[in-house]
Amino acid sequence: MKPFIHNDWWPVLEPEFEKPYYQELRRFLVEEYQHYRIDPDMYHIFTAFEWTPFSQVKVVILGQDPYHNPGQAHGCSFSVLPGTEIPPSLVNIYKELQDDLGVQPVQHGYLKHWADQGVLLLNSVLTVRDGIKTANTHRGHGWEQLTDSAIEKLSARPEPVIFILWGSAARSKIKLIDTQTNIVLQSPHPSPLSAYRGFFGSKPFSKTNIALTSLGETPIDWQLPQQVTISDESTSDTH
């Protein structure tokens, strides 16, 4: 099989792409992309893996499924393309980041600076139908098996990983993580529906950097650049 993730994630995940569930998922996606507008476009489904190679992952921020408004999703949890409106959950993430570390909010939602430092921005479901009331339309079709495998492989690495789990869906993944060797930070989701129930004040960013320092790793510079341009994010597809 020709690689369609172009770094060391490929040998980690290639066995999953050979399994029957992924073949079913691929057939489902072919139909969906033919008949509906799907987020993200098929060339950016695996951007999270492209941006943050397996061996360089220090932190995982786990999301659910992509944003489903036009032009926002590009394959990374909570991140949106420059020039699109910052979603409410990310606005709240920026608020907590400012309260936690004094980091100044920016006028974009493009989180590549974090990914470049080893923060894997992973959704548990990698595609969704575009439009109103289309959240979770690709749930239960196989993506969860692939991303669960990615979480398990990271958990089993000799180098510890910090898993940031926001909300009940993300927190349910703790069963995949060896909590004896990795670090898990949990809180309610940053959505406006739940942010005031414990996300605000949870200090995930400072806690992450304290943990990284204790592990002998370089802390994350959470301050995003004020100006960004879109990089060549990914050339992957759904082979």
Swiss-Prot record:
This is Uracil-DNA glycosylase. It is found in: Cytoplasm. It catalyses: Hydrolyzes single-stranded DNA or mismatched double-stranded DNA and polynucleotides, releasing free uracil. CDD domains: UDG-F1-like (cd10027). It is an enzyme of class 3 (hydrolase). The gene is ung. It comes from the Bacteria. Its EC number is 3.2.2.27. One of its GO terms (molecular function) is uracil DNA N-glycosylase activity. Pfam families: UDG. Belongs to the uracil-DNA glycosylase (UDG) superfamily. UNG family. Excises uracil residues from the DNA which can arise as a result of misincorporation of dUMP residues by DNA polymerase or due to deamination of cytosine. GO terms for cellular component: cytoplasm.
